[in-house]
Amino acid sequence: MKKYLMLFALFAAAGAQAKEFFRVTDLPDGWQAHISVEGCKDNHCGGKGAVFLYHPKQETTNVFKSDDLIFERGEGSKISAAKSPLIMKDFTFDGLKDIAVATGNKGPKNSPTYDIYEQGEYGYFGSNYSLTELTKNYMGMFRIDNKQKALIVTNEVDCCTRIEERYRYSPEYILTLFYSRSVDTSDEDKVVVTETRTDRRGNEKTTTRTYTPAQWKRLNK
């Protein structure tokens, strides 16, 4: 009971200027979250907000603040994890769920950005600068390849060139680029794909292939 009274006090204090309060349902592994946000108009919520994350079996309550906690609300005071401004997955491949908290649309071409927090001992989450920067320098939230233990990011250089890069993550918070691909569609009659692979010794190998638009479309079905 004492734990939940403390949580309520934190929630009330941090959300003193907030106008809307929600509970996030169906987070993984039993995690629970409440969020406060400055305001909502129609179904769109945004502005300054706070996230209160806790687990019934842990003593720690984590509080994350955001300058622009944007998300689409549903009906009532509950929102599903999928529609919330939170993403809980294992970003660092250590078997523990980490969390991404929305911070607005500050990435390239107004793409969404997130603050990333890595789970440590006893349910405590600490800020992860390296992963946060990935969301600011590329377009949107990175994807996870569990088989390769890689983080996948994308970007658009100009109107016709799209970039994909893959990074390995080490426990020392180091990101190592090991694969990049650029797809150039500036010529309507061809697609030029350049791939660079880097092995663990740092040796690079670059290949360039040209496809017709129809061939490229078939390859990416």
Give the ranges of each region predicted by the language model.
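Beta-propeller blade termini
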Residues: 21-26, 36, 80-91, 136-150
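Beta-propeller fold detector
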Residues: 63-67, 126-133, 176-182
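Acidic carboxylate motifs that coordinate Ca2+ or other divalent cations, activating on Asp/Glu
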Residues: 94
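Repeat-based blade/solenoid architectures
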Residues: 66-85, 132-142, 161, 189
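Beta-propeller blade repeat segments, especially FG-GAP/WD-type strand-to-loop junctions
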Residues: 54-57, 110-129, 166-171
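Acidic, small-residue rich beta-repeat scaffolds with periodic aromatic anchors
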Residues: 17-52, 146-221
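Hydrophobic beta-strand segments that make up the repeating blades of beta-propeller
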Residues: 99-103, 151-154
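Sec-dependent N-terminal signal peptides
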Residues: 4-13
